[in-house]
Amino acid sequence: MTDSELMQLSEQVGQALKARGATVTTAESCTGGWVAKVITDIAGSSAWFERGFVTYSNEAKAQMIGVREETLAQHGAVSEPVVVEMAIGALKAARADYAVSISGIAGPDGGSEEKPVGTVWFAFATARGEGITWRECFSGDRDAVRRQATAYALQTLWQQFLQNT
């Protein structure tokens, strides 16, 4: 997805959130704040973007958004239980209506047989208690994996929670 397409998607998300009087927060690891950056590229995004958390280290995940050390130790940072706790923690800390969390292995190193480079977990949560998780495996270099993860996060937020609702 091009920068222009990411911006267009972010504008769609923003318009839908603004129409609802709702806000979103992000908790990002492998994307390093890219989702928050794309969101804040839109003029007026302060009306619907509460804040973003870049929780690259396990310590940051625990300190900033309350991911339990036991969860990190048992499942690893790139796992469904961790992204769920990231989304819930960000939602609570920001008092937002929607949360998006992302943790993955962008490469070129760090992959394993169980979690190859390109593996990314996503969680989406709402203040109403709804939530979904997804695991994707993207291809390409580090930049490509991170760009695809950013696009996927925005597309899923739009399609699953904001479009036609």
UniProtKB/Swiss-Prot annotation:
The keyword Ubl conjugation does not apply. Signal peptide: none annotated. It catalyses: beta-nicotinamide D-ribonucleotide + H2O = nicotinate beta-D-ribonucleotide + NH4(+). Its EC number is 3.5.1.42. It is an enzyme of class 3 (hydrolase). GO terms for molecular function: nicotinamide-nucleotide amidase activity. One of its GO terms (biological process) is pyridine nucleotide biosynthetic process. Keywords: Hydrolase, Pyridine nucleotide biosynthesis. The keyword Hydrolase applies. It comes from the Bacteria. InterPro entries: CinA-like_C (IPR036653), CinA_C (IPR008136). Pfam families: CinA (PF02464). Belongs to the CinA family. PncC subfamily. Has NMN aminohydrolase activity, not active on other substrates. Homodimer. This is Nicotinamide-nucleotide amidohydrolase PncC.
